[in-house]
Amino acid sequence: MARVTVEDCLDKVETRFDLVVLASMRANKILKNGYSESMENEKKEKATVVALREIAESEITPEQILRNEIEG
């Protein structure tokens, strides 16, 4: 996927507002823990783009993001 769009992600979440909250939670987690070895273009893509791409490609589910946020 060359570019991530909101439409790519809306199949995975209920509303755009949920998408914003979930993507920001995931991006903050990426920034806090650092980029993993499996993430491509870690120096070229910002954490928000990586988070949106993960959501769009179902690499991580909204439930997993919320669970990770609760667990800390």
From Swiss-Prot:
Which Pfam families does the record match to this protein?
RNA_pol_Rpb6 (PF01192)
Give the gene symbol: rpoZ
**Reaction catalysed?**
RNA(n) + a ribonucleoside 5'-triphosphate = RNA(n+1) + diphosphate
Question: What's this protein's name?
Answer: DNA-directed RNA polymerase subunit omega
Q: Which InterPro entries match?
A: DNA-dir_RNA_pol_omega, Pol_omega/Rpo6/RPB6, RPB6/omega-like_sf
| Top EC group | transferase
Carries keyword Transcription?
yes
EC number(s) on record? 2.7.7.6
Its quaternary structure? The RNAP catalytic core consists of 2 alpha, 1 beta, 1 beta' and 1 omega subunit. When a sigma factor is associated with the core the holoenzyme is formed, which can initiate transcription.
**Gene Ontology terms: cellular component:** DNA-directed RNA polymerase complex
Q: Which UniProt keywords apply?
A: DNA-directed RNA polymerase, Nucleotidyltransferase, Transcription, Transferase
Q: Which SMART domains match?
A: RNA_pol_Rpb6
Per the UniProt record, the source organism is: Francisella tularensis subsp. tularensis (strain SCHU S4 / Schu 4)
Q: Which GO terms describe its biological process?
A: DNA-templated transcription
**GO MF, one example:** DNA binding
Query: Its biological function?
Result: Promotes RNA polymerase assembly. Latches the N- and C-terminal regions of the beta' subunit thereby facilitating its interaction with the beta and alpha subunits.
Protein family per UniProt:
Belongs to the RNA polymerase subunit omega family.
